[in-house]
Amino acid sequence: MTNSTAHLLRKTTADWGLSLNDHQLAQFERYLDELMTWNERFNLTAVRDRAAMVRRHLLDSLWLARVWETPPDSLIDIGSGAGFPALPLKILYPALPVTLVEATGKKATFLRHVIDCLQLHNIRVLNERIETVGQNPTEREHYQVVTARAVAELRVLLEYALPLLRLGGHLLAPKGRHPEVEIAAAQNALALLGGEVSACLPVEIPDEEPRSLVIVTKTAPTPNRFPRAVGIPARRPL
């Protein structure tokens, strides 16, 4: 990480009330090194510029920590891909128990590689479809927080996420600048799955287009029939 990108990461997070030490900055640097190397073979991200990676991936992920008064006791990330937002949050909060769900084998291999490189603990990768994970009794209604970035439209994402949350837990769903259409289309899914949109926050990252964070709170148990079989939520949204 160049001095300028390290300064951007440290200064911006400090402005947000978050603190990064030298070890964490070194972990972020190694993370980007591995991402850029693996990206040449596996196309993990369309972003190639290192400074843009800091803004669009690292800072965009770390912004989610601003909504917590204290870190959650458990987090599961859906469709983790290259690890955003969960891996930056894990680096920020080393004690946070994290589960990454990634159905694509090559991406899951990359995630395990980065976890080993960064010597992260209390974190695991599930190379499974999210519909299968959501019907697993050991995972279902277990988590305080679900994160998912660029996975699906909100009404589909709700069927993936809400079965994993315990009552009072939260889905953090980064969205574009105007998520109102997605929220309106998700009202039936919210009613069926036991959730409500509790906040929609503006997200501002230096030199990036404004976007938003939709927060959904689980308010009632999710019926056992959800999530439906693999592929059905995306093909037939609620």
From Swiss-Prot:
Return the broad EC class: transferase
**Gene3D superfamilies the record matches:** Vaccinia Virus protein VP39
* Sorted UniProt keywords: Cytoplasm, Methyltransferase, rRNA processing, S-adenosyl-L-methionine, Transferase
In the record, what lineage is assigned to the organism producing the protein?
Bacteria, Bacillati, Chloroflexota, Chloroflexia, Chloroflexales
Q: Which InterPro entries match?
A: rRNA_ssu_MeTfrase_G, SAM-dependent_MTases_sf
Record-annotated residues binding S-adenosyl-L-methionine?
A: G79, F84, E102, A103, T104, I130, E131, R149
Primary location class? cytoplasm
One molecular function GO term is: rRNA (guanine-N7-)-methyltransferase activity
Briefly state the protein's biological role. Answer: Specifically methylates the N7 position of a guanine in 16S rRNA.
Q: What is its EC number?
A: 2.1.1.-
This chain's protein is named Ribosomal RNA small subunit methyltransferase G
Family statement drawn from the similarity comment of this UniProt entry = Belongs to the methyltransferase superfamily. RNA methyltransferase RsmG family.
Q: Where in the cell is it found?
A: Cytoplasm
Record's GO cellular component terms: cytosol
